């Protein structure tokens, strides 16, 4: 099964010219698992740390201003991850988050963004060649269809296309938690997500590097524009970004 999946992925990537291992949305678990405390104390550690840097996003919805989100970053705990995110906020390397979109928003879960390389080529209501992304979640293979050139399949770090997981010292501490999206171990790039609920099952899989310090109400407004599939009802864009 695994060999077949890899073969399909390789063929699709070669055919479309797209990456078959683009960052996918963090996995969702059932409310039953949460209510039973299935993930309680699975990973020890703090849910926050000292803030060393503060950055911001000015967000629009359908071209209209939605508000500003400020995020405090944990530079003492994950300096490499923080340096990457900060540089992409300022655009000091010649590329970054300004003008990119939150391409996947799932109410009661998270808002994901950070693909600033492929977001411009997506055309609403129009399908092109598709690829299959196989995510290995525990012992299950989950197939997702993605537009071959669509938002959510790109991005890059300041260190190259990807960089390793720095550590998992900070746990996902509920709404406002800022964490790296990935396509598996050691595949961090530029994509990230802001949690809108408790997500303890992500501990040990995604690197937490900050939290929302101002504008959680703006995150809630963004959340209301999403859907269970992750598709947004209107374009949610980072119009500007930088340091505070």
Predicted regions and their residues:
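Cyclophilin-like peptidyl-prolyl cis-trans isomerases
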Residues: 5-8, 15-244
